[in-house]
Amino acid sequence: VPEISDDEVLVAARSVGVCHSDIELLEGRYIIPFQYPLIPGHEWSGEVVKVGPSVKGLKLGDRVVGECVIGDDHFGFSISGAAAEFFTAKESWLHKLPDAVDYTNGALVEPFSVAYYALMRVGNVNASDVLVVLGAGPIGLAVTAGAKALGAVTLVVEPVAHRQEAAKKLGADYVV
């Protein structure tokens, strides 16, 4: 079990997603420079099990999710991530997980945030748009659902049958 600094908490991982970038990292070909040993895991939720003395906004038992990019560091890439039984994190990196959100869905906050950013901040998607979504993994499916909620027409390109079905269930207009 790792030791914590005064401004850190110890988190017990409760749910950790495996992103394609984690696979690239483990294969030694991720785009951000990194050095082994390194623990992957940037899509996660967990429980605070120990609190450093200068931490004021979190307490034992708090359910949390965390930031992926922290300044120059990338959680699970340039610094070790959440794919461990326990890991440390700075209070400023964490957000409380609402009681209505279970740990499994909490681990989806990061990929859903990527989809939200793409739709709302980069794409400014609205009902006049037609989107082509390349891939129906977690981020592609979140983009599909979000685009439909915004009224856009969606075309999802996905070779895997069960992911095609998931895209249809989330409202994709066309799936190829």
Label the predicted regions.
Residues 2-16, 29-70, 98-101:
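Glycine-rich beta-strand-centered segment in the early N-terminal region that forms part
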Residues 12-14, 26, 90, 135:
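A secondary-structure boundary/capping signal
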Residues 20, 42, 117:
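Histidine-centered active-site/metal-ligand motif
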Residues 21-27:
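Cytochrome P450 core scaffold surrounding the K-helix E-X-X-R motif
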Residues 26, 49-52, 88-89, 176:
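Short beta-strand-to-turn element immediately C-terminal to the catalytic PLP-Schiff-base lysine
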Residues 43, 62-63, 86, 130, ...:
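Residue-level marker of beta-strand positions
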Residues 57, 67-134:
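NAD(P)H dinucleotide-binding glycine-rich loop of Rossmann-like/cofactor-binding domains
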Residues 104-176:
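Mid-domain Rossmann-like dinucleotide-binding core that forms the NAD(H)/NADP(H) cofactor-binding site
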